[in-house]
Amino acid sequence: MSDRDQIEPVTNALDAESDSSDDFGNFSDASVENDLYNQNSTLTTSSESVVDNCLNKILPKGEFDLEEETIKNDCFKLSKLIEDERPHVIYEQLVQLDPVLQPFIWNKSHIRRNLLHILRLSDNNGSEGVGTKREEEPLNDELFKRICDAVEKNEQTATGLFLRDNFKIDYTPPMTLKSLQKEEEREQEQHIPQLLMADFTSMDEESLRQYHDTLCQSIDFLVSKSRSLKKQQRDLLKDKTTFENVVTNLTGHTQRLQRDEIALYNKKRNKKKRFSWVGY
């Protein structure tokens, strides 16, 4: 046989083996996949054990039991501390009840003022115009005191203009019809708060004069109303005193009648007992 004839059977055998391996798969590849799976499972197991070891070091099982015992001991100590009435009330107000906390206002807090003072900063937030605010002189209340004294004396004036007759203040009296006087007084009373809030510093001479007259008329109205209320108060006190005297007299008269009835009953009863033997 020639060399060519010997090579052909060997080649055919190799081809047959390759065909058989293609039919059932590559066994060499299967062994490599198994090795990779074993390596992955080993890595997974080792990583889980590492995590478990770390957790056991950080959170050992024995500490939980110790913490429960510590909590129980603390609760027992706390119950001992608040056995008395005063500590119990303080604990209830601070812990158990919901405290009503006042809202913290930063712009008005002393912490902000101290901080600005330490840092040498100017306070421009919410306090603009404080430094430039016009300084007002305190009002003299001498007139108010004299008016109150005159109201207490209840002295009647000739014209009914209180300020003009008592203090010689010149102003224009109100020009109102008698039928519309009550309505005018009601409106005047409603406008008194506006008079007190008015800024008279920026008024001209005519407006200032009108404001002065309106203010004096309002003072006359308030004095008149105060006098009427004082008179009504005196009448009510007089009625109250009369009612109390009537109630006292009625109470005494009722007690007197009750004593007389009891005495009459006892007298009849004693008389009946004295002559009770006559019937036998």
Swiss-Prot record:
It holds the Pfam family YBL010C_LAA2. GO terms for biological process: clathrin-coated vesicle cargo loading, AP-1-mediated; protein transport; protein-containing complex localization. The keyword Isomerase does not apply. It is found in: Cytoplasmic vesicle, Clathrin-coated vesicle. One of its GO terms (cellular component) is clathrin-coated vesicle. The keyword Glycoprotein does not apply. Disruption phenotype: Leads to a severe defect in clathrin-associated adapter complex AP-1 localization. Causes increases in the calcofluor white (CFW) sensitivity in cells lacking CHS6. Keywords: Cytoplasmic vesicle, Protein transport, Transport. Residues 1-26 are annotated as: Disordered. A motif (Ear-binding motif) lies at residues 19-30. Present with 1320 molecules/cell in log phase SD medium. Involved in localization of clathrin-associated adapter complex (AP-1) and subsequent AP-1-mediated clathrin-coated vesicle cargo loading. Directly mediates the interaction between LAA1 and AP-1 which is required for AP-1 localization. In complex with LAA1, cooperates with the small GTPase ARF1 and the phosphatidyl-inositol-4-phosphate (PI4P) synthesis to confer temporal specificity to AP-1 recruitment. Interacts with the clathrin-associated adapter complex AP-1. Interacts with LAA1. The ear-binding motif (EBM) is required for the interaction with the clathrin-coated vesicle and its recruitment to clathrin-coated vesicles. This is Clathrin adapter accessory protein LAA2. It comes from Saccharomyces cerevisiae (strain ATCC 204508 / S288c) (Baker's yeast).
